[in-house]
Amino acid sequence: CFIKIICMRIISGTNKGKRLVAPKKLPVRPTTDMAKEALFNILNNNFQFSQLSILDLFSGTGNIAYEFASRGSKEITAVDANYDCVKFIKKTAQELDFNITTIKSDVFKFLEKAYVKADIIFADPPYDFDEKEFLKIPQIVFEKNLLNQNGQLIIEHSKHTNLSDFPNFI
C-alpha cells in the first residue's frame, strides 16, 4: 500500500492475505501486521477462536475484529465513537460475510452501561490519553466484571504507558 492511505492485511484464517484499504480520512492508526501477528500467535496457543466472544474497543478500522472473524470467532462486537469508522467496519464486515456487531458509542459510556461479557476484550485507545483516562479502561472492565472466566483484557498502548502498578496486569 502507498503512503496516505490506511492499508491492512488479514494475517490468517478464511480471509488470509486479504488486503483492506480504509478511507484516509479515518482518525486511526491500525495495529501493525507485525504486532497483530505476534498477538494472535500467543492467543492461538491459548484459545479456540471459534468459541470466543470478542469485544473490540476503540475499534477504528476494525482491523482486530476482522482478524478474529477470519479465524472463526462468531461473536464479535466492535465499539468506536467515530461514525465513519463504524460505517467502514459495518460495510467491510458485510463484504467479507463476517458477523461483527458494530456500536457507535463513546467507549467509556458503553462500558458503564455494558451488559455483555467477553472472553477477550481488546482495547486500542488513542495514544494521547493521559494515564488517568487510560486506566479507566481496566478499572471499569474489572469493576463491572465484563470478562468471562479465564478471559483476557488486552490493551495496546504507547511505550510510555506504565501498567506495572495496576492490579491484574502481567
Task: Please give the residue ranges for each predicted region.
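Class I S-adenosyl-L-methionine-dependent methyltransferase catalytic core
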Residues: 1-170
